[in-house]
Amino acid sequence: MASKDELACVYAALILLDDDVDITTEKVNTILRAAGVSVEPYWPGLFTKALEGLDLKSMITNVGSGVGAAPAAGGAAAATEAPAAKEEKKEEKKEESEEEDEDMGFGLFD
């Protein structure tokens, strides 16, 4: 789980990104001070160095684009099993209807 210091730096970086401002150590520190959050001094520098040269907006907007392929493969397997499941349901319905004809409801008074 992320610590308070990590989350504070992440949120500060997201605020700067949303305002189209360059993410620098000084600006992250400014936001943290304005929010009244105290973090270890190495966190803002660590985050700004990790985010250098990355296109964060494209990363955020394309988060789910790579995930779509996995469910499609699982769906194909389920589609091949569907006819077998339908046949089983038909057989169960036939058995139930035969039992209903035999019972006729007279077991209610037993």
Curated annotation (Swiss-Prot):
Residues 69-83 have a biased composition (Low complexity). Gene3D superfamilies: 1.10.10.1410. The keyword Protein biosynthesis does not apply. Part of the ribosomal stalk of the large ribosomal subunit; P1 and P2 exist as dimers which assemble on the P0 scaffold. This is Large ribosomal subunit protein P1. Residues 69-110 are annotated as: Disordered. Residues 84-96 have a biased composition (Basic and acidic residues). One of its GO terms (cellular component) is cytosolic large ribosomal subunit. Transmembrane segments: none annotated.
